[in-house]
Amino acid sequence: MCIRDRWEAETTPADFAHYVHFIIEQLGSELHYICTINEANMGIQVAAIAERYKRQMMAQMQAAQSGGNSADGSVQVGINLQKMMEGQKAAAAENLEVFGVEKVENFTSMRTREGDLLILKAHELAKKEIKALYPDIKVGLTLSLHDIQPQEDGMERAKKEWDEEFMHYLPYIKDDDFLGVQNYTRSLIGADGQLPNPDGAELTQMNYEFYPEALEHVLRKVAKDFHGDLYVTENGIATADDTRRVAFIDTALKGIVSCINDGLPVKSYFHWSLLDNFEWQKGYSMTFGLIAVDRSTQTRHPKESLSFLGHWNQ
């Protein structure tokens, strides 16, 4: 795929379907659930944030130098957007040497509208391959979804943001067996787009707001239009204070129970993450885990939040 224009290539859906067919032939008898594509909307989110970053680059750099916020907290993944933009020239030279092209469109690259559609076509073809071989396997994908909250004069813009993040995917996923919901925080929207975090708001290591209520809000909003099963496939918090992780988990799970009590088909909760992981460009500095890891010895140290989640009962 790297030599065929990558995830923006017209051949990508067929290539992906061929890959899926091979995998299912080998492993299908052992599988009950398959997520074809993780965070199918990530490329569109990165593209929107990068565009905003370009417009605000100088202001953001000045703010960062004086202790202000960066743009990183507006995407639910550990990408250092400033370093990404600064490193584009060096990356182009390296890509040319390794792949023969200046720009490698990997899955988390800034995605065009056409590329976004190719992702959805790839999902549809993959689902067709899976169902043809093993019709009982449950198939879906996951989306990274913010709790989009319109503020004063922000109603129309918030509607547009939700369409980009979720609604325009609906025609392609409405018949899926399930949807994986991945949420970490909320997004406050004004007339011109995303607003800064509220003054005095508690922020996570990822620089977005500590707001565990977001998960319940997103599940309820999604369930209005998607009628398959809902799986919380990612939810958690990057923090060095494990008591805040415990509080986050408690609020998030109470929100799920409320949804289930109201009849929403929420079937699971997968916490992110079991271990303090390597978080994209931010490396090991983001501590999401229920278990800490000493990287010099690889020794695991369970945190109190691990026991709390394991024994949680409303």
Can you describe what each PLM-predicted range is?
Residues 1-314:
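Non-catalytic scaffold segments within catalytic domains of secreted glycoside hydrolases
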